[in-house]
From Swiss-Prot:
InterPro entries: Cyt-f_TM, Cyt_f, Cyt_f_lg_dom, Cyt_f_lg_dom_sf, Rudment_hybrid_motif. It is found in: Cellular thylakoid membrane. Component of the cytochrome b6-f complex, which mediates electron transfer between photosystem II (PSII) and photosystem I (PSI), cyclic electron flow around PSI, and state transitions. The lineage of its organism: Bacteria, Bacillati, Cyanobacteriota, Cyanophyceae, Synechococcales. The gene is petA. Heme binds at residues 35, 55, 58-59. One of its GO terms (biological process) is photosynthesis. It comes from Prochlorococcus marinus (strain MIT 9312). It comes from the Bacteria. This is Cytochrome f. Its cofactor is heme. Keywords: Electron transport, Heme, Iron, Membrane, Metal-binding, Photosynthesis, Signal, Thylakoid, Transmembrane, Transmembrane helix, Transport. Binds 1 heme group covalently. Belongs to the cytochrome f family. The chain crosses the membrane at residues 284-304.
Length: 317
């Protein structure tokens, strides 16, 4: 009965998240590009064999991501993995239509096998408050230990709390007590490359050839066509979408690879690894017994010392 309830809760949460995501694509396409959803669509696992999280394939700029995970947790317990995605307040970026939009954030937490998103009935009031407005989803049905979040408004979600449930080795022999690794990624802002490999408008555009800029055509939608004439008189046209600002003008001489625009990107992706120890209750009991034993030994030594001092004093030594 409990498993059925958990499945219903998971499916309901996923359904709500899907509705929100589809709505965001339909009504706000300019702010919903290259977040964890795209990784789901294109990669079986969000982490490559090299250790790189695949979000970095679209988000080329590097920015710090911070994680707070408890040093150790008990079996079958709920704990918080906090992902911090820092950036300057009220920072704006360019959307797909070239307008300024607020940054959004996304995060992925790859938990060890056996660890998973804690069911909502086990969330504390504090966790419920900290996760209000945040929708979690599993990377896939087969990978319930990989949790993704986003896109979310960045200014109010620079810290994302993931409620995690640890496994219980006493009831499932597949899992063991010991040290485990977590792989965490956090992103702010749009990507520079689409999953197809095409550039977005959130990147520096460069010249593919050397020569002189013959002319620059401004298109109706605000984009540009930069016409470059090489030494043989051949014209190469570079398309620059709306958004980035041109830093060249007609008659400028340029080389292949030179930038034609500024760098409009203000966001970036960061990843890190963390460790957590799944603590055996017997080890905890053993440590407590050890410390009690050490304490008693010290007390006995002090008492023995005082007894010796009394004997010596009585004998006039």
């Amino acid at each position: 009965m409990k498993d059925l309830k958990n499945q219903i809760m998971r499916k309901t949460t996923l359904f709500i998240f899907s509705l929100l995501f589809i709505s965001s694509i339909l009504f706000y396409p300019k702010t919903t590009f290259a977040y964890p959803f795209w990784a789901q669509q294109n990669y079986e696992s969000p982490r490559e064999a090299t250790g790189k999280i695949v979000c970095a394939n679209c988000h080329l700029a590097q920015m710090p991501t911070i994680a707070e995970v408890p040093q150790s947790v008990g079996a079958d317990s709920v704990f918080k993995a906090v992902v911090k995605i820092p950036y300057k307040n009220d920072l704006k970026e360019i959307g797909a239509d070239g307008s300024e939009v607020p940054l959004q954030v996304g995060a992925v937490v790859m938990l060890p096998d056996g660890f998973k998103l804690a069911p909502q009935e086990r969330w504390t009031e504090e966790i419920k408050e900290e996760t209000e407005g945040v929708y979690f989803t599993n990377y896939s049905e087969e990978k319930d230990n990989i949790i993704i979040v986003g896109p979310l408004p960045g200014d109010t979600n620079k810290e994302i709390v993931f409620p995690v449930l640890s496994p219980d080795p006493s009831t499932n022999k597949e899992y063991h007590y010991g040290k485990y690794s977590l792989h965490i990624g956090g992103n702010r802002g749009r990507g520079q490359v689409y999953p197809t490999g095409d550039k977005s408008n959130n990147v520096v555009f460069t010249s593919s050839t050397s020569g002189t800029i013959n002319s620059i055509d401004t298109i109706e939608d605000g984009s540009y066509k930069v016409n470059i004439e090489n030494e043989n008189g051949e014209i190469t046209t570079e398309a620059v979408p709306v958004g980035p600002q041109l830093i060249v003008k007609a008659q400028d001489k340029i080389n292949a690879g030179d930038p034609l625009t500024n760098d409009p990107n203000v966001g970036g992706f960061g990843q890190l690894d963390a460790e957590v120890v799944l603590q055996s209750p017997y080890r905890v009991i053993g440590l407590i017994a050890f410390f009690i034993g050490v304490g008693l030994t010290q007390i006995l030594l002090v008492l023995k010392k005082k007894q010796v001092e009394k004997v010596q004093a009585a004998e006039g030594i």
